A protein has these predicted regions:
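Hydrophobic alpha-helical transmembrane segments
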Residues: 1-39, 63-66, 73-149
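Acidic (Asp/Glu-rich) catalytic motifs at the cytosolic membrane interface
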Residues: 38-61
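A mid-sequence, solvent-exposed acidic-amphipathic segment
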Residues: 50-51, 67-71
Length: 149
């Protein structure tokens, strides 16, 4: 829900206010933002898989379990980046969106840290949330600059 609000609604509403009319293309630009916001929230749920499950809280991560939660993380950000690059390929944004890939080493480190935990304690992963937030930041800036050009 947060991804939809901060992605689709905020991006589309902002574009509509600036342009003084609704343009359906703003939804295409908003989709990567939905993925980025959801990607941060998903990562933040990973360290608490065991505690959430023990407390009766249902999250996507604890439904999936640790193995599948890692798989989803490994897929998530590449899909976000492909959706951003697709904006350029479809002519909705300029080439600066390619700078979203600057976050690739950060993503790579985060997924390696998750994999290294295996079935053990994932609480330590909370310390590395900055990696995913930096993926969001670099991807977001690349989208802003790419759309502005």
């Amino acid at each position: 829900m947060v991804g939809i609000n901060l992605g689709l609604i905020v991006v589309s509403a902002s574009a509509t206010i600036i342009a003084q009319s609704f343009d359906i293309r703003s939804l295409a630009v908003a989709l990567p933002v939905v993925g980025m916001v959801a990607g941060i929230l998903y990562y933040q749920s990973l360290p608490e898989i065991d505690t959430d499950k023990a407390g009766g809280k249902t999250t996507l991560a604890n439904i999936l379990g640790k193995d599948h939660a890692l798989l989803v993380f490994r897929i998530w950000w590449p899909v976000v980046w492909m959706s951003i690059i697709n904006l350029w390929l479809s002519g909705l944004a300029g080439w600066p969106v390619l700078f979203c890939l600057v976050g690739l080493p950060l993503y790579w480190k985060a997924q390696k840290l998750i994999a290294a935990r295996g079935d053990g304690d994932w609480l330590e992963l909370d310390r590395y949330g900055y990696l995913v937030r930096l993926c969001y930041l670099t991807s977001g800036i690349s989208c802003i600059v790419g759309v502005a050009l």
